[in-house]
Amino acid sequence: MSPCKLLPFCVALALTGCSLAPDYQRPAMPVPQQFSLSQNGLVNAADNYQNAGWRTFFVDNQVKTLISEALENNRDLRMATLKVQEARAQYRLTDADRYPQLNGEGSGSWSGNLKGDSATTREFSTGLNASFDLDFFGRLKNMSEAERQNYLATEEAQRAVHILLVSNVAQSYFNQQLAYAQLQIAEETLRNYQQSYAFVEKQLLTGSSNVLALEQARGVIESTRSDIAKRQGELAQANNALQLLLGSYGKLPQAQTVNSDSLQSVKLPAGLSSQILLQRPDIMEAEHALMAANANIGAARAAFFPSISLTSGISTASSDLSSLFNASSGMWNFIPKIEIPIFNAGRNQANLDIAEIRQQQSVVNYEQKIQNAFKEVADALALRQSLNDQISAQQRYLASLQITLQRARALYQHGAVSYLEVLDAERSLFATRQTVLDLNYARQVNEISLYTALGGGWQQ
């Protein structure tokens, strides 16, 4: 039988060769089967949780515009996309080793005598060479599978960068809003303190107040000016952070006060299964890495067995181009080769040990990813109710402080209390207004964190 007829048979036999990789089994999830949920933000238990697209989750149109711009220009996302392309090319490169390699060649030579003999010897040759490795024990197949899983893991890593970018842009935008609102409160408070200073100064001239009260009024003015400078710096830093995420340094949107309706609340069914974590890209990335490590064990095991390669070719040679392709000038060759590992000082065993240890490391990494993801969701759920309770209490406290300040001012005007009582009420009101803003921002960030922890942010 000619080599040309043997080659397709060998190819089919090699491609259906056995695999020495262990059967893959997904590790059990090292977390509770369900999340512990309060009644806050729950929907009907019969409803399954579905991640809303980010265009639905975020209500504020400005946030949507910024996210779209970041997805187009952000350098981290662009780098992640390039890594996916690199991993895809690497997979194609490795997978190509499983198939026959066919190369053509042609050459010509001219030679003569340096002593003056004019006779010139000419020689022309051409040929085709084919080579193929018989993958009886699945070494090449498993190496290709490992690269395929690495490629899929890189795709999931790119998804994770995408989701993180959506989250970071939204949080950065809300942080800009917070910094602007804090600055507005500080400037408003400064105007109130200046009015109080003018009033105390007027009373001092009439003898109804004293120098101590005037100095106290001047002191809170300077303290507030310091706070304004701090808030201005925070606003500038928030703008810089947002521009970095956007990947461009164009004009940013005008900062506005914090809007509590900028996003939807994440609605979760009672008895939410922790299986939902398996849709997170970081966990899917870890699983693909585990499957790659599993395939590498198969490749390492195959190194203990013989490897067979086939080389075949046809060629022609002639001193004249016109007769180069005559049948009488052609020849063929077929060279099978087998390599049997006999002694390599434990190299193959060491490679297998490394592959098995790395597979065990991948299992641990996969389990860690799941535990971290479970904690992120559990923390966000626990903080959700706490923040709502804190905001309600602080708003009631704020209303009480507004009444207290009004009464303190009235009593001071009638000489019933010292100016220190007014200052204490003003300071408390100022601090509480800032606290309410901080809590509202924290609630927004926590809702985004919960949305992201459940794998949201990939789809539009």
From Swiss-Prot:
Signal recorded as keyword: yes
Keywords: Cell outer membrane, Ion transport, Lipoprotein, Membrane, Palmitate, Porin, Signal, Transmembrane, Transmembrane beta strand, Transport
Molecular function terms, GO-annotated: diacylglycerol binding; efflux transmembrane transporter activity; porin activity
Signal peptide extent: 1-17
GO annotation, biological process: monoatomic ion transport; protein homotrimerization
S-diacylglycerol cysteine: lipidated positions: 18
Database matches in SUPFAM superfamilies: Outer membrane efflux proteins (OEP)
Function statement: Forms pores that allow passive diffusion of cations across the outer membrane. Part of a cation efflux system that mediates resistance to copper and silver.
Annotated protein name in UniProt: Cation efflux system protein CusC
